Amino acid sequence: MKILSIGNSFSQDAHKYLHKLAAANGLEINTANLYIGGCSLEQHWQNITADRAEYDLEYNGGEAVGKISIQQALISDRYDIVTLQQASHLSGILESYDPYIANLAAFVRKYQPRAKLYFHQTWTYEKFTEPSPYGNYYRQVFANYDFDQEKMYQQLTDCACVAAAQINAKLIPVGTLIHKLREATPEFNQNTGGHVLSRDGYHLSLDYGRFAAAAMWLYTLTGVLPKPESFEDFDPALLRIIVDSIPEIQI
């Protein structure tokens, strides 16, 4: 299976372990991520219309191997799956999606007519505390949701569902999994001293956050629930909690 993500650092988070996790479960998945930090649907579309080769091309969760445009990426290989997503700072603002999501989907299907299209539902920011341990960007964006994690979750989920339906794509519900882990499992609830699933207030933690995203992608795209017995040097008990939460996810 070959996957292309037209994304940013949030798809970078999701891709980090996906290739390796798939291999550990007897599957071959090769991923390509088109990375510009914080890139929105609007910016992706502008880059297409100007044919800008400004994306870092990252294979299988690794470092960038060069610069490329979206069109170059789409014609350079045949993909089974192409994913789209909105930038996190706009993920819960519905008017930021149009007309760019439809334009992007049509462009992808023009060059990859056999590929299945998925929309990557991203996740909320960490709960706000004062004084905040996070920076100004976190503060500025989270203010759009009144520093309310539940409000941000509901808005970005509503937007993801609308966007996916609009372009006839399936959802990869990473945001719902992260929200469930934070709310329903003490081991990942920061209020009870659990592991924080973010490393800076918005990007996923380098261990369990990124593992959760990869596991959700693997299950959504292949139907295979990963074996949590061992991965990297992570705690198998925590991996089990993440994996056991995945089949329960509904949007």
Question: What residue ranges belong to the model's regions?
Answer:
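Conserved SGNH/GDSL esterase-like catalytic core that processes O-acyl groups on lipids
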Residues: 2-4, 10-98
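Alpha-helical cap/lid subdomain in secreted, periplasmic
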Residues: 67-206, 219
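Conserved catalytic region of serine esterases and O-acyltransferases that act on ester linkages
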Residues: 187-251
